[in-house]
Structures are given as structure tokens and as C-alpha cells.
Amino acid sequence: MGLSEMGGPAGRPRVVGFIPARMAASRFPGKPLHPILGVPMLEHVIRRAAMYEHWDYLTLATCDGEIRAFAEGIGFPCVMTGDHHVRALDRVAEAYELVASSDLLGGGPNDDDVVVCVQGDEPMMRPDMVDAVVAPLLADTGIPATVLAMHIVDEDLWRNPDTVKLISNQAGEVLYTSRAPIPHGREGFSEDLMARRIYGIFAF
């Protein structure tokens, strides 16, 4: 798909996607390449993310040679970043600068670009989830960033500190996030709490 000088097709901002992944996950080392139904988890994410129809560019972002070799084996782009990043979004930020400064996008970094992070451990993601975080940014340039949130209907997930919950106001603006079980009702968990968790898809 060709890019115009103004950005993406028909002059819209470019939509640039990154799938950050690393082998040294503290809770599950080697998780990105762990097989699910005989296919590495990361490949499930790639296949599903690629179904979104409006990418101007989509690539892996990693510091691991093993993941780069996997990407080369399936013919998928991969950007090598530093190994010092603690957060996936920091890796994505570096990867974007590398991609935007290369000939891959043409025209260099652009403040109008919409940068999307699809976490490499979300094998059940769907292309409409990408649209859910991208569409608000395309519609309103005053929105700085978006994150996908999912309702929690399971008490164990609500109590799990590995699950990041969020609280937002009525306008949908995130007020704060926590690994604690929030919001917390007087009688503990119930679906009426409308607790929500962060799903690993972000855009900014």
C-alpha cells in the first residue's frame, strides 16, 4: 500500500503497529515462542494483528536474536531494539524512532502518526480491537492515547496481581491503574462492580 506525502492513504495519519516481545519474561521465560495448538504464541498474535486492514506498517520489536530468527523464518518484519527496556511501551517508542527514521515509512517521524502497541502475549486479540484504540485518535487529534479495557467477570482474575485494573471517569478517561482488586465493594467481588482490566493493545 503506497503512502502519500501527507501520511497514509487519502491523507489520513499513518497507522504504524508494533508487536513487542522478549524471551526473558520474568513470569514465563520463553513465552513468545511457546506453542499453542502447535503454533508459537507470537505467530498467533501476528496472524491476528495482520488482519487489521489499515496498517501502514506492522512489525515485531525485540531485543532477542531468537525472536528475530523466528520472524525471518515466517517472512515478517522485525526491528531490533536495546535490551534495557523494562516496559513494552518503551520498546515500542524506540522501535518507532528506528522505523520512522528509516526508509520504511518515508518522510521520517511525524507527530500525526498513530503508533499502536499490540502486546506479543495476546493470542486471542482481534482486528476490531485495534480499530477500537485507533479510531478515537483518528477522529479527535486532541486525544493523546488510548488503551483497550475489558470487563472482569471472574473473581480470580480480579484478585490476580498480574492483572492490571483501571478506573476511569464517565468520559472514559483513565484516572488510575492498579494491580490491586479495584474497585472493591463492601461484600467483595461482583459483576455489578463493573471492574475492568487493561488488555494489551494501546495507541498514541
Task: Locate the predicted segments by residue.
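Conserved core of the sugar-phosphate nucleotidyltransferase
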Residues: M125-A203
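Short phosphate-binding loop-to-helix
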Residues: M51, T59, G65-A135
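Hydrophobic/aromatic residues located in beta-strands of well-ordered beta-sheets
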Residues: G17, L58-L60, V115, A145-T146, ...
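Active-site donor-binding loop signature of nucleotide-sugar glycosyltransferases
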Residues: G38, T81-D83, G120, S168, ...
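Short, high-confidence coil segments that cap the C-terminus of an alpha-helix
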Residues: W55, N110-D112, D140-I143
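Short beta-strand segments
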Residues: P20, C117-Q119, L148-A149
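N-terminal glycine-rich phosphate-binding loop and ensuing alpha1 helix
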Residues: L3-T62
